[in-house]
């Protein structure tokens, strides 16, 4: 279904508890507009849990990763983005960095991240899944809904479209 975040704000702001993500994120990935139910991860400079999560087949979910805003390595690259797209993920939000930005632009998935960084992350296996995470003035919870387009990112407790 077609939507715009501006349209969602016009229609639902004031009647639904919308949260609007601060405009910190750059677009990556071949899809500019995406939405779905949220799955949350909290990791720091480690992508093992990200890979495990994206390897699971889902029906149109969006992975929201709190990477602590680290600018010392990338949490997501071309291989993980392709894995996500192949398994039904609609989008990935990374509060941190990505790499392989040219390749990401060819993968049929929506991606938002703070920046790029050429160094890959550690592979130690730490992190938490399905926990409350907070960044960019928004509380992200598993099973809430995220809507992203060229204008921004909106989060709602309820399905809007």
From Swiss-Prot:
GO BP, sorted A to Z: regulation of RNA metabolic process
Q: Where does a divalent metal cation bind?
A: 100
UniProt entry tagged with the keyword Oxidoreductase: no
Q: Which Gene3D superfamilies match?
A: Ribonuclease E inhibitor RraA/RraA-like
Cross-referenced InterPro entries: RraA, RraA/RraA-like, RraA/RraA-like_sf
Q: Where is the signal peptide?
A: none
Is ATP-binding among the key words of this record?
A: no
Report the superkingdom from the record. Answer: Bacteria
Q: Which residues bind substrate?
A: 77-80, 99
Q: Which reactions does this protein catalyse?
A: 4-hydroxy-4-methyl-2-oxoglutarate = 2 pyruvate; oxaloacetate + H(+) = pyruvate + CO2
Known cofactor(s)? a divalent metal cation
Q: How is the cofactor bound?
A: Divalent metal cation.
Per the UniProt entry, the Enzyme Commission number(s) are 4.1.3.17, 4.1.1.112
Q: What class of enzyme is it?
A: lyase
Q: GO MF annotations for this entry?
A: 4-hydroxy-4-methyl-2-oxoglutarate aldolase activity; metal ion binding; oxaloacetate decarboxylase activity; ribonuclease inhibitor activity
Entry keywords, A to Z? Lyase, Metal-binding
Share what the entry says about its subunit structure, partners included. Homotrimer.
Q: Note the NCBIfam families from the entry.
A: NOT-MenG, PRK09372.1
**Which protein family is it in?**
Belongs to the class II aldolase/RraA-like family.
Q: Please give the function described in this protein's UniProt entry.
A: Catalyzes the aldol cleavage of 4-hydroxy-4-methyl-2-oxoglutarate (HMG) into 2 molecules of pyruvate. Also contains a secondary oxaloacetate (OAA) decarboxylase activity due to the common pyruvate enolate transition state formed following C-C bond cleavage in the retro-aldol and decarboxylation reactions.
Q: What is this protein called?
A: Putative 4-hydroxy-4-methyl-2-oxoglutarate aldolase
